[in-house]
Amino acid sequence: RPHRHRHTFELLLPLKGRFVVLNFDDHGAITNRVVLGETCTALEMEAGTWHTVLSLDAGGMVFEVKQGAYQPLAEMDTMAWAPAEGQPGTAEMMAWYAIAQPGDRFLSMPQ
């Protein structure tokens, strides 16, 4: 589910496999797409960046670095149009992540 960490940067390092990392604007449009583990070997996102990560390979592992102690995400830090993990529509949304490009928006999201 697309989310943000308002108070910390996030650094992603692929340990095994490849990962699609999508960044979004406040309205849910994709602003950036990176395949971590191909030509990109590390990705740092500023605090407050809306993003999601999808593993492209079975058994993929990514190392995340954030500042400070673990803080669970508040509902306000997840995109309301995206279903929570395990909810109806999750499989369709994850399939879309794999092919989505900058400028795209998830078709079934409320307008």
Where is each model-derived feature located?
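Glycine- and acidic-residue-biased ligand/ion/polar-headgroup-sensing regions
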Residues: 7-26
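Short acidic-glycine-tyrosine-enriched beta hairpin
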Residues: 11, 25-48
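Double-stranded beta-helix
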Residues: 27-34, 52-111
